[in-house]
C-alpha cells in the first residue's frame, strides 16, 4: 500500500558530480536546465551556476587532474537554490564571501576575470560561501 504524501511535500533536491574540467561547466549547465525547466528565473539561475562552476574549475583544487565539483539544486516555495561544491584551495576572485561582493573586479584583475561573483550578486536574491573541511560550497538563491 502506497503512503499518501502531504500536498505540501517539497520536491527532492537534485545533484550530480562532474569531473573538474572546463568542458564540464557546459554539462553542469545542461543538467541544471532540466531541473529548472519551468522556473521563470531559470536563465538567471543557469548563468549564476555557470559562473560558480567555472570558479570551481579555475580557482580550486577541483580543476586539477582527477578533481571534481558537485552541483546541487532544489526548487521549493517559489525559490531555487543552487550549490556548487568544490575541492577547496586558494580563494582568489576578489575575497567575496557571504553575499558581500567586496572589491571584485576592482582588485587588479582585468578582462573577464573576477566578474563571476559580481554577476551572481546582481542576479541572486541571496548568495554565500560555506567552508567545510577541505571543501567549499558557494550557493545562491533566486526567486522563481
What do these predicted regions represent?
Residues 20, 36-40, 61:
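Short coil/turn residues that cap or connect secondary-structure elements
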Residues 27-50, 98-105, 111:
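Conserved short strand/loop->alpha-helix "switch" segment adjacent to the catalytic nucleotide/phosphoryl-transfer site
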Residues 44-62:
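Histidine-centered phosphotransfer motif of kinases
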Residues 1-15, 57-144:
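Conserved beta-strand-loop-beta-strand hairpin that lines the nucleotide-binding pocket
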Residues 15-25:
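STAS-typified acidic loop motif
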